[in-house]
Amino acid sequence: MNAPASVVWVLPDKLGGVAVNVADVLAHRASRGPAHHVVLTDNRLSHDVRFEDRMRVDGLHRVQYTLPSENLHAVLRRLARAVPPGPGVLVANDWLELAMLSIHDPGRMVIFILHGDYDYYYDLAVAHEPLISAFVVLTRFGHEHLSQLLPHRRETIFHQPFGVPRAARLRSEGLGHLRLLFVGRLDRAKGAHLLSGIDAQLHRSGIAARWTVVGDGPCAAEARTGWVEPTSALWLGARSNLEVLSLYAHHDVLVLPSRAEGLPRAVLEGMSAGVVPVVSDLPCGIRDIVEPGRSGFLPRPGDIAEFAEAIAALASDRRRLEAMSQAAHQAVHERFDVRHHAAHFEALFARWASLFRPRPEHVALRYGSRLDQPWLPNALVKTLRAVRGVRQPAQAR
């Protein structure tokens, strides 16, 4: 008797938008649909915060590994064994599962989700295109860009954003200082190092604001320097998604001076609660969400003065702040309801048989070094790398 079709999601065990988006789709899927399994890949040499929230799944598997210390082939065999047998869909979200698919055939139709408008995801899509049956991109820009890179695959490239749940509590009108919020990894790509400069510009305009900064990362120390009043910023570090959701109702403006984004979840969640976004105007999913001047502001990336000017406009005109708050909430409620988007994902999964592409006869593994050989014992490879300090040129993510 043939096994029923099921869906297997493979993704990194990291706290962040990828895991939270997947968890939301799983939470809102139909109860009578196919079984869903999640395989979390956990590099024990990574310092990323693990995803601790529960997922509504029929099976949860964790695959731990230590790259670049281990033999890559041993890690890929371990991952392949964690994928439940049977037909259906394998949803790939990062490089490790695509590498696994290069040498192991799970017998499933493969969907690859590009979680951001970054070269990283586009490069993976192009490199592993023969193994991928369908691509999911989150933004209109991403759909067009990937279609230009892979014009022969345009019909199997789907623009399918993730949604967010409706906010449990809407933002309350503040009476004192404007309440500013930053949510994201503290690195230069997210613009965390620009926050103190924006605050200084606000002070020069006579505006005192209160900041809450959520996140951690390599730019944490730099982000904490240069504040006119260091006590005006509350640093919360990395927090779970549930904790972040509880913060939005107590803030007025979400400030995100990124230089690269996809479809930023923090913007969707904040707007759902009525928090007005002031975010970089990037050629990605930002304009899929924010209507400039109505539901938020889109300063030029890296332009501290424009960010401060937009925030100052809201601080000096609270009626405008309230109107934009309502518009932000309405925009997400109408276009990014997670229930609708979860149903769209289910409809795509249901097409697995018609979208299935036969596996190429010969596929090269694009990662690894001379020590990454299927016939070399993993223990030997780990010992040699520990002694010699040799690092394999595999992906570090």
Each language-model region and where it sits:
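Aromatic "clamp/platform" in nucleotide-sugar-dependent glycosyltransferases that forms part
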Residues: 259
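A conserved mid-protein helix/loop that constitutes part of the nucleotide-sugar donor-binding site
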Residues: 17-24, 178, 182-201, 218-222, ...
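Short alpha-helical donor nucleotide-sugar binding micro-motif in glycosyltransferases
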Residues: 238-239, 246-251
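Conserved acidic donor-binding segment of nucleotide-sugar-dependent glycosyltransferases
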Residues: 291-293, 297-304, 313-318
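Donor nucleotide-sugar binding/catalytic pocket of nucleotide-sugar-dependent glycosyltransferases
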Residues: 131-168
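Nucleotide-activated donor-binding/catalytic signature segment of Leloir-type glycosyltransferases, i.e.
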Residues: 223-239
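Short His-centered aromatic/hydrophobic patch
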Residues: 91-97, 114
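Short hydrophobic beta-strand element within catalytic cores of glycosyltransferases
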Residues: 276-280
